[in-house]
Amino acid sequence: MKHGKNFTLGEYVIIKKPELVKVGNNVRIADFCRISSGGDGKYTFEMGDCSSLAAGVKVWLSSNDYVNELVTHSIPEVKEIQGNVRLGKYTGVGTNSVIMPGNDIPEGVSIGALSFVPSNYKFEPWTVYAGRPIRPIKKRNKENVIKTLRKAGYLKD
């Protein structure tokens, strides 16, 4: 796993194929998170600067579609949904949320606790999302976030 400065990894975190994981500066992956490559293991997970996964977040880079006759991961012929997952700068994912394959989460997005992010969801930057499945709740104030990070010493002018 490649990581930037001030990276914090919680306890009991499971990262399958850490060589496919890249995180930026000032990033936290809290306790009990799981990042699972599955499938053929070629898909990547990236976290931008000042982003975080709260406790218990699950990130899947591969999953079964569960709509055909063979609905078990032990059979290789099962159709899988696979894709990279990327979290942009200043993003946060709340406790026990689930992120499915193929998501590009843009700068400033915040995902509330216990949320479910379906594959290939279309996000708007600087927006708060929550729910099962997620939906937009409200906009975030980019200037206030940046100001707070600067004041805390995480960003330089």
Regions inferred by a protein language model and the residue ranges of each:
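Extended, small-residue-rich solenoid/repeat segments and analogous flexible loops
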Residues: M1-Y12, L155-D157
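Conserved beta-strand-loop-alpha-helix hinge in the C-terminal portion
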Residues: K122-T148
